[in-house]
């Protein structure tokens, strides 16, 4: 008995226009989701990088200043130099003229200036100031810290330092940018009102210090920014540094206040 096989052919059907449009729509939605995740990841990375830079700027700025503050008033063992006041309050030449004192209280939210006097210790075979210039033996140095404003070549303000030889009254280092992204520097001076305990009774600004011999500590605050502009920009707010008027900016950069206190040991 023979068997017969019947082969039937099905007509091939393609996608309808509606199905094609639905597929394209789903594909676009998926693509938009991937793009959104990519953009969000990029923004998160940029924000985290900016915040890390901000933290680094603030910590390094305080470290530069406190290195000099901890040495303030120091003279090496056996030195013939008279022990200086830790805080220098006479002419520093910070700014555009040579008539600016080292201890300046900025008006309102304007930055302060602070200078510390000491005999530099020998490091790597030489005595150096805050900018790395060599200081001769048996000479006192003054490291003065201040804020260098932004300009056409530098979009953000910076912590600056310049120094001079306190023994000869000669300039050592011209103004140097130390740390970019520092908007403000504020300083308060701890006063021992009794004059015999080296214990702080009050903190005051430079213009309220009547007896620099009773200054036994210094409180320092800096306002650091992220240098890079963030997108989306942080919400504009006020930043409070010690007794200064609030600082505010809407330039799209993140900011944070860093504060420390240094007790003078060389009194």
Model-derived regions, located:
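Short linear sequence signals and composition-biased patches located at protein termini or domain-edge surfaces
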Residues: 6, 49, 53, 57-60, ...
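Aliphatic-rich helix starts adjacent to a transmembrane/signal segment
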Residues: 2-8, 12-74
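A short secondary-structure junction motif
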Residues: 37, 41, 157-159, 189
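N-terminal start-of-chain detector that recognizes signal peptides
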Residues: 24-27, 35-37, 84-89, 150-155, ...
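Catalytic core of tubulin tyrosine ligase-like
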Residues: 155-158, 179-181
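Residue-level detector of short, conserved catalytic/binding motifs and their immediate flanks
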Residues: 15-18, 114, 143-145, 157, ...
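C-terminal globular interaction/adhesion domains in large, modular proteins
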Residues: 83-154, 160-162, 167-170
